[in-house]
């Protein structure tokens, strides 16, 4: 769904869908002066999403509740940070909101659940409070909250460069493709720790110059498998972080072993900093059949699993 970001809501309540993402490509190029890593990524939205309900109030206060008792609803939550940030853009200092999160994306899974929730909050309150910020303005705000937030706002299939906030569209891909996504529910991986571990092991090989960064970006742009990206030409998935996470994380190895056993899987990889892993299928029906045929094996593995179609957009208003 395309959102008119300047559209003002006449209602006192609305809901926003916040989809997860996977990394079809994640390449660590080097280290930036601002302390972040320089990345070359291809990210894809999938049809696994959180739902966030917003109710407008007039007391200037912002509150957050969730159906997940394990989720912090304090000031460290990106939803509250996003709400407080966009509240500063409103000319009405009395605007407030009661926010409720229905959590479906697993936490600490490399799926940008927190970033997508932040993006959904920017979109929801931009409309509910009548602020009228444009897509570019919201993406700029989002980049202050996290590197993945701009992608989550736009969604679909995007090149993500810089620390992840610099987006470039790619030619339209075959949206009928789908994934089986799996994760050990007892395991989380810290994204900062994953990058720190990668730097510790591979830092001596980092590129140093902008012209070298750009050569790697262009190499990704020119990759033959992107045109077309479809079931006859699946992507040769690459995730540099997998090189450091997989050897020391049994949950990742277990997930990849399970996925590799599924009939019809085209390619597989870890997403983001993990521990979630995914296998790509030609279509959703094929993914569902493959998973259903392996329910007993899935139960024995201790993994949670989802079948998710590729999604052509990011956060969207719930109609």
Swiss-Prot record:
UniProt superkingdom: Bacteria
Keyword field: ATP-binding, Isoprene biosynthesis, Kinase, Nucleotide-binding, Transferase
SUPFAM superfamilies, per the entry: GHMP Kinase, C-terminal domain (SSF55060), Ribosomal protein S5 domain 2-like (SSF54211)
Pathway: Isoprenoid biosynthesis; isopentenyl diphosphate biosynthesis via DXP pathway; isopentenyl diphosphate from 1-deoxy-D-xylulose 5-phosphate: step 3/6
InterPro entries membership: GHMP_kinase_C_dom, GHMP_kinase_C_sf, GHMP_kinase_N_dom, IspE, Ribosomal_Su5_D2-typ_SF, Ribsml_uS5_D2-typ_fold_subgr
Catalytic reaction annotation: 4-CDP-2-C-methyl-D-erythritol + ATP = 4-CDP-2-C-methyl-D-erythritol 2-phosphate + ADP + H(+)
EC number: 2.7.1.148
Catalytic residue positions: 21, 148
Any one of the GO BP annotations: isopentenyl diphosphate biosynthetic process, methylerythritol 4-phosphate pathway
Keyword Iron in record: no
GO molecular function: 4-(cytidine 5'-diphospho)-2-C-methyl-D-erythritol kinase activity; ATP binding
Record: residues binding ATP: 106-116
Family that this chain belongs to: Belongs to the GHMP kinase family. IspE subfamily.
UniProt-listed NCBIfam families: ispE
Function of the protein: Catalyzes the phosphorylation of the position 2 hydroxy group of 4-diphosphocytidyl-2C-methyl-D-erythritol.
The protein's name in its UniProt record: 4-diphosphocytidyl-2-C-methyl-D-erythritol kinase
Organism: Prochlorococcus marinus (strain SARG / CCMP1375 / SS120)
Lineage of origin: Bacteria, Bacillati, Cyanobacteriota, Cyanophyceae, Synechococcales
């Amino acid at each position: 769904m395309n959102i008119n970001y300047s559209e003002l809501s006449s209602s006192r309540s609305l809901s926003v869908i916040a989809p997860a993402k996977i990394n079809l490509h994640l390449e660590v190029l080097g280290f930036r002066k601002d302390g972040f890593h320089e990345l070359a990524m291809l990210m894809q939205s999938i049809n696994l999403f959180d739902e966030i309900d917003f109710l407008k109030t007039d007391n200037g206060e912002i509150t957050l509740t969730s159906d997940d008792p394990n989720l912090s609803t304090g000031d460290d939550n990106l939803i509250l940070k996003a709400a407080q940030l966009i509240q500063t853009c409103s000319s009405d200092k009395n605007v407030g909101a009661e926010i409720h999160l229905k959590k479906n994306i697993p936490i600490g899974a490399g799926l940008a659940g927190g970033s997508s929730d932040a993006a959904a909050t920017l979109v929801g309150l931009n409309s509910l409070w009548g602020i009228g910020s444009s897509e570019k303005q919201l993406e700029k705000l989002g980049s202050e909250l996290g590197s993945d937030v701009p992608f989550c706002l736009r969604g679909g299939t995007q090149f993500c460069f810089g620390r992840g906030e610099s987006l470039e569209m790619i030619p339209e891909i075959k949206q009928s493709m789908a994934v089986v996504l799996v994760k050990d529910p007892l395991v989380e991986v810290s994204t900062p720790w994953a990058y720190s571990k990668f730097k510790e092991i591979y830092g001596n090989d980092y590129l140093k110059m902008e012209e070298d960064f750009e050569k790697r970006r262009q190499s990704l742009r020119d990759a033959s498998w992107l045109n077309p990206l479809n079931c006859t030409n699946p992507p040769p998935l690459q995730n540099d972080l997998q090189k450091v996470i997989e050897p020391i994380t049994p949950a990742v190895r277990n997930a990849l072993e399970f996925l590799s056993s599924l009939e019809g899987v085209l390619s597989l990889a870890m997403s983001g900093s993990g521990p979630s892993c995914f296998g790509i299928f030609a279509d959703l029906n094929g993914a569902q059949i493959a998973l259903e045929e392996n329910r007993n094996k899935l139960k024995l593995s201790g993994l949670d699993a989802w079948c998710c179609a590729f999604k052509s957009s990011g956060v969207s208003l719930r109609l």
